[in-house]
Amino acid sequence: MAIDENKQKALAAALGQIEKQFGKGSIMRLGEDRSMDVETISTGSLSLDIALGAGGLPMGRVVEIYGPESSGKTTLTLQVIASAQREGKTCAFIDAEHALDPVYARKLGVDIDNLLCSQPDTGEQALEICDALARSGAVDVIVVDSVAALTPKAEIEGEIGDSHMGLAARMMSQAMRKLAGNLKQSNTLLIFINQIRMKIGVMFGNPETTTGGNALKFYASVRLDIRRIGAVKDGDNVIGSETRVKVVKNKIAAPFKQAEFQILYGEGINFFGELVDLGVKEKLIEKAGAWYSYNGEKIGQGKANAISWLKENPAAAKEIEKKVRELLLNNEDSKPDFVVDAADAEETNPDF
């Protein structure tokens, strides 16, 4: 429907005034002069990239990864950093827990010589560093480990036993309002690792909650719930963890998908194991008995030998990965893999 000529003139004058006052690009029509596709970074897990629907975690957004202790939260973020560095991106790690192991990070493929690292004294300092890095436009990925360790300055300077009700939640709420715009403008991905706490007196429903108030839940474009669901064994020796990640919130694709993969101790996510499983599932890799074949050529007897072949033939592995992504990404299947928990779906005040 055509807009009245006088209204068009008034709109053009208003747009011109806004651009003159706030700069070019401060207002635009949604479909013009911008890519509608969200740029993403791989998580290091093929099945999780597919569950996210866009091929990875979105740039310019806030992501929250939470779960119990030793569930693989830090490992997953280090794999994201390794993926970003392989693409030539600059990454920073805000180590509020003072627990980052550089030897382990290097084993996961992180270039620790080019990884920016900060161990802030207070929560305010950590969030100000995040904001400064985002505003610089020179850092592509920032990881904060963890929200629970972002202690307000007043709490650190006070006595043990003093009451500091709502301080951390207020600090996070203020920081998220400030960070959201800067992250979008600089196209910086900000990942918060978070811990789980139990609500007291919950008789029905899930008593679990995350720390730092509700602001992060609102501002996060993606929320991932990561859990250890079993052990990976070689004989009697435990060599890794079976891990399940649920996409609890997703603003870039259909939510409520889940992915399962292995995290091997000292190696990280078992990417090639996922590649074999998904390749067989999508009939890209043929499996007859214990033998695996690709393009009519036998690649190994048993899954371990098939994985070894893929590691030795990166071109074939890349080809299979590309085909799997083309088959499974951006399909129209929006059917959820799990039922969302009422605690995750409820709307509450974002300031606390």
From Swiss-Prot:
The keyword Ribosomal protein does not apply. This is Protein RecA. One of its GO terms (biological process) is DNA recombination. Pfam families: RecA, RecA_C. It comes from Enterobacter sp. (strain 638). Keywords: ATP-binding, Cytoplasm, DNA damage, DNA recombination, DNA repair, DNA-binding, Nucleotide-binding, SOS response. It is found in: Cytoplasm. One of its GO terms (cellular component) is cytosol. CDD domains: RecA. One of its GO terms (molecular function) is ATP-dependent DNA damage sensor activity. The keyword Transmembrane does not apply. ATP binds at residues 67-74. Can catalyze the hydrolysis of ATP in the presence of single-stranded DNA, the ATP-dependent uptake of single-stranded DNA by duplex DNA, and the ATP-dependent hybridization of homologous single-stranded DNAs. It interacts with LexA causing its activation and leading to its autocatalytic cleavage. Belongs to the RecA family. It comes from the Bacteria.
